[in-house]
Amino acid sequence: MFVQKKKSAWLNQFVQCAVFAAWACAPAVASADQFGVQVAGGVADHDIKKADLGVAWDPNWTWWEIGGFHFTVVGEAHVSYWRSTDDAAVHPNIFEVGITPVIRFIRSSGTIRPFIEAGVGIRLLSHTRITDTFSVGSAFQFADMVGVGAIFGTHQNYQAGLRFQHLSNGGIKEPNPGINFSQLYLEYNF
């Protein structure tokens, strides 16, 4: 009973901190050149499903114009929820929070602007042990990501993409098996 109350109190504090961080960052994001809200869903090995809510900031930095395409950088902040459907799950509900700078190679103009992207960010997890036989070692994780997608619409307000994400603690602590997510995401840009 005491352990359950402690978990509930920790979860409540985690959610309050995430809401406060989003509220505190809102003015900075709102004054940016362009920002967006992203929702994603994904699946991973070890019977884990992931729901993700993100905020993206595009400072409109461009360089290396090549054949109608150019490079750009986008900053993203994420809060995610993992759900393990494994019967042996010790912590079936895990929260993740983190940031990722993303480099894109994107079409420079058009109603539909395809891109490829890659990024390396950091994440913090609420729990490190998912089942008795699977643990990610530490709450601190690196998040490597590659993906494809497109920005579209008359005002370039919409974005959709597919990403492959690998989380690992980079050998900081054992065990370090890593975990791989395949994710679909949608974004609305303001």
Describe the role of every protein-language-model region:
Residues 37-43, 75-81, 116-122, 162-166:
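Transmembrane beta-barrel strands of outer-membrane/channel proteins
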Residues 41-43, 57-59, 105-107, 150-152, ...:
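Residue-level signature of outer-membrane beta-barrel architecture
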Residues 51-55, 178-190:
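Outer-membrane beta-barrel "beta-signal"
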Residues 42-51, 88, 110, 171-177:
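Solvent-exposed loop/turn segments connecting transmembrane beta-strands
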Residues 48-50, 96, 141-143, 179-181:
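Membrane-spanning beta-strands of outer-membrane beta-barrel proteins
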Residues 1-32:
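Cleavable N-terminal export/targeting peptides
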Residues 29-34, 60-71, 106-114, 154-157:
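Short loop/turn motifs that connect adjacent beta-strands in outer-membrane beta-barrel proteins
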Residues 40-41, 86-90, 130-136, 169-174:
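Extracellular loop and loop/strand-boundary signature of outer-membrane beta-barrel proteins
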